[in-house]
């Protein structure tokens, strides 16, 4: 017997409301785009798109000719006005495509503005007094206390406390994230809300410079800068337009020599059909839509250039922890060395971790607790904490009695112990190798000049990583894993995950060296990062994807920011970049291929009366010369709105080699660009023939 499916009425209403709001927003965007289509007819706006500007000039000329009597004209009076209207709609359709793409960005900006409500901040003055001021009066360096239920007034970094923060206004993710002082996860964003506990933050941006302000200005696209590839393609298309313009302008000289004249409206129609109006009308929309697709992935691109660069990436540099593995390295077991005991290792491991707020440090405390190993917490709390640094690759505590306790990478701690005059137990490297071969991370525990044992930190490779790296390999992209682990651990993880290369015991300067080495080979490099120590490498990379949960320095150095703080998203970003480039290339191919059919429609129509042999080119058997010209023009106009969904969504992309992609696109959009207009123009000709 089947059980009835019960759905709460409230849930149904919520879903219905969301669907209704989405439909309303889409309708509003379309209405706004239609209005903007006419507003963009302003020549000052149109001249930014030379191809469509030529079409607009053609509309003006034919429109004026419609009201000027001409006894020498060989075409009826209605022909000029019909041509002018078709040209007007051609321009309007192109404007609509651009306005529609811009409208989606503005809709996202409007939703972001909702998070910029008037909020007040509890500012801590130098004398300790707390004063409530408006968020707009905050300046960089101000100290602010944010309590449970309060909105974070501006961008900042946590310097005291720990709290759960709801970032759904920025990321769309409802689950709160933990923000705490110290480390790489101290950054908070204005417009987010503290849902538990209390934190003290230092403001890192002045009014108008916050993260949300930057997001709004970027997604609105009001001052969108064209990318280098877009400029280059636009230059080529403009050059083609200029060449065809010269051809059409000089054509009457030759026709006069042959003893017949061509009407101005026919010449304008010929020019419009020859120039690449399809891609000219969709070029801006493709670029804006590419930025929009990245934004929908919750990635903020600082420029269209960054998105395009992602499509040309040859090498991706990935951190092991948190990207390839889950990053939750936990203490798995303790391994004593020499004649030491587990209790001794556990005692000193715990003392070195009492003040260590990292997940690894906390896991050591939890592990020691589960094993009921006793240690003196008080002496650790009274000591001076030595934080982990990428340069030293170890952390610990200096106790008040002068004892120095350290835990860290095998090589670093061994070197430190030797510098203290100590000796190294014979089984240290043996046990470290055992942990590494298991795919774990060994941390050596030492006190002054004596090594007590190792902590076995265990991490797990994320499922599906091998398949994703194989897809990148098919795309011709090399993957390089950078990790602070020793070579054995790095090799084990690299083999399991399926990366092409790895760099073990990697320091921040090593990442920069890897990036420069790849760039010296003429390759474009992408990398992810979240810490201040990643900032130089993020700035050096062609595509630097910083995590929103990371430090301000990392986000300022990168040219993309992932609002979900998911490092593996760099793979999706590369796919979106390739999709953008492929869409532009495919529609350019389609647009130029269209011209072949238009030649067979318009050329015979223009010259058949003077040169009867030209009738042989009328392979579509179009009804009449006037019908042929109008059919070609109508197809030229109608194809633009028909291709808007493809320009906005992007063409389907599957991981494959560049040669395979080129062959596939030439077959679909090259051959398709030849066949479709033959069919379309013929169908339109049949319909037009019924009226003339």
From Swiss-Prot:
Annotated compartments: Cell membrane
Metal-binding is among the record's keywords: yes
Record carries keyword Mitochondrion: no
Bilayer topology annotation: Multi-pass membrane protein
PROSITE patterns the UniProt entry points to: ATPASE_E1_E2
Top-level taxon of origin: Bacteria
InterPro entries for this protein: ATPase_P-typ_cyto_dom_N (IPR023299), ATPase_P-typ_P_site (IPR018303), ATPase_P-typ_TM_dom_sf (IPR023298), ATPase_P-typ_transduc_dom_A_sf (IPR008250), HAD-like_sf (IPR036412), HAD_sf (IPR023214), P-type_ATPase_bsu_IA (IPR006391), P_typ_ATPase (IPR001757)
This enzyme's EC code(s): 7.2.2.6
GO cellular component: plasma membrane
Gene Ontology molecular function terms on file: ATP binding; ATP hydrolysis activity; magnesium ion binding; P-type potassium transmembrane transporter activity
Binding positions for Mg(2+) per the UniProt entry: 530, 534
Active site feature: 319 (4-aspartylphosphate intermediate)
Residues annotated to bind ATP: 356, 360, 388-395, 407
Signal sequence extent: none
Swiss-Prot/TrEMBL keywords: ATP-binding, Cell membrane, Ion transport, Magnesium, Membrane, Metal-binding, Nucleotide-binding, Phosphoprotein, Potassium, Potassium transport, Translocase, Transmembrane, Transmembrane helix, Transport
Catalytic activity: K(+)(out) + ATP + H2O = K(+)(in) + ADP + phosphate + H(+)
Annotated TM spans: 50-70, 77-97, 240-260, 266-286, 600-620, 628-648, 672-692
Family of this protein: Belongs to the cation transport ATPase (P-type) (TC 3.A.3) family. Type IA subfamily.
Oligomer status and interactors: The system is composed of three essential subunits: KdpA, KdpB and KdpC.
Described purpose of this protein according to its UniProt entry: Part of the high-affinity ATP-driven potassium transport (or Kdp) system, which catalyzes the hydrolysis of ATP coupled with the electrogenic transport of potassium into the cytoplasm. This subunit is responsible for energy coupling to the transport system and for the release of the potassium ions to the cytoplasm.
HAMAP family: KdpB
Protein name: Potassium-transporting ATPase ATP-binding subunit
Source organism of this protein record: Bacillus cereus (strain 03BB102)
């Amino acid at each position: 017997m089947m059980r009835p499916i019960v759905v709460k009425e409230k849930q149904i209403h919520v879903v219905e409301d969301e669907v209704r709001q989405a439909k309303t927003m889409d309708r509003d965007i379309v209405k706004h785009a239609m209005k903007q289509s006419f507003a963009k007819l302003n020549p000052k706006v149109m001249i930014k798109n030379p191809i469509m500007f030529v079409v607009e000039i053609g509309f003006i000329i034919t429109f004026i000719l419609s009201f000027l009597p001409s006894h020498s004209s060989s075409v009826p009076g209605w022909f000029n006005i019909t041509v002018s209207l078709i040209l007007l709609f051609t321009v309007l359709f192109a404007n609509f495509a651009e306005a529609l793409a811009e409208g989606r960005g503005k809709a996202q900006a409007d939703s972001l503005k909702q998070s910029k409500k008037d909020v007040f901040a509890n500012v801590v003055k130098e004398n300790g007094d707390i004063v409530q001021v408006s968020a707009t009066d905050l300046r960089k360096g101000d100290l602010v206390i944010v309590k449970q239920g309060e909105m974070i007034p501006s961008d900042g970094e946590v310097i005291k406390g720990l709290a759960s923060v709801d970032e759904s206004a920025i990321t769309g993710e409802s689950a709160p994230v933990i923000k705490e002082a110290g480390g790489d996860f101290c950054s908070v964003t204005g417009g987010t809300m503290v849902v538990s506990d209390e934190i003290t933050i230092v403001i890192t941006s002045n009014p108008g410079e916050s993260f949300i302000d930057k997001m709004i200005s970027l997604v609105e696209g009001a001052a969108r800068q064209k990318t280098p590839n877009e400029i280059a393609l636009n230059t080529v298309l403009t050059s083609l337009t200029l060449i065809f313009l010269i051809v059409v302008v000089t054509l009457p000289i030759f026709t006069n020599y042959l003893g017949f004249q061509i009407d101005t409206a026919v010449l304008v129609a010929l020019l419009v059909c020859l120039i690449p109006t399809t891609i000219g009308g969709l070029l801006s929309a493709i670029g804006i839509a590419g930025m929009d697709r990245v934004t929908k992935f919750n990635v903020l691109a600082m420029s269209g250039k960054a998105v395009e660069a992602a499509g040309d990436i040859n090498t991706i540099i990935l951190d092991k922890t948190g990207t390839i593995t889950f990053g939750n390295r936990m203490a798995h077991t303790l391994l004593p060395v020499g004649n030491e005991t587990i209790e001794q290792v556990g005692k000193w491991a715990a003392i070195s971790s009492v003040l260590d707020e990292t997940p690894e440090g906390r896991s050591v405390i939890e592990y020691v607790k589960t094993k009921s190993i006793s240690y003196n917490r008080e002496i650790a709390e009274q000591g001076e904490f030595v934080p982990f640094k990428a340069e030293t690759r170890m952390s610990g505590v200096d106790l008040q009695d002068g004892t120095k306790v350290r835990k860290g990478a095998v090589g670093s701690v061994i070197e430190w112990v030797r510098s203290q005059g100590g000796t190294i137990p014979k089984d240290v490297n043996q046990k470290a190798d055992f942990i590494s071969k298991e795919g774990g991370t060994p941390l050596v525990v030492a006190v002054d000049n004596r090594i007590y044992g190792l902590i076995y930190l265990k991490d797990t490779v994320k499922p599906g990583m091998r398949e994703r790296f194989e897809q990148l390999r098919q795309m011709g992209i090399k993957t390089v894993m950078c990790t602070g682990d020793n070579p054995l651990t790095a090799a084990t993880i690299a083999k399991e995950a399926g990366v092409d290369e790895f760099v073990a015991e990697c320091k921040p300067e090593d990442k920069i060296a890897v990036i420069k080495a790849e760039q010296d080979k003429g390759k474009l490099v992408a990398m992810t990062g979240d810490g201040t120590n990643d900032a130089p490498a993020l700035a050096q990379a062609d595509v630097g994807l910083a995590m929103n949960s990371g430090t301000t320095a990392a986000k300022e150095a990168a040219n993309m920011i992932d609002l979900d703080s998911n490092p593996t998203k760099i793979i999706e970003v590369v796919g979106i970049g390739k999709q953008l480039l492929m869409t532009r290339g495919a529609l350019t191919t389609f647009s130029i291929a269209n011209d072949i059919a238009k030649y067979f429609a318009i050329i015979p129509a223009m010259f058949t009366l003077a040169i009867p042999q030209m009738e042989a080119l009328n392979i579509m058997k179009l009804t009449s010369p006037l019908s042929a010209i109008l059919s070609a023009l109508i197809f030229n106009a109608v194809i633009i709105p028909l291709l808007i969904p493809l320009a906005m969504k992007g063409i389907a992309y599957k991981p494959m080699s560049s040669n395979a992609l080129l062959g596939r696109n030439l077959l679909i959009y090259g051959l398709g660009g030849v066949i479709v207009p033959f069919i379309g123009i013929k169908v339109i000709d049949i319909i037009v023939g019924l009226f003339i």
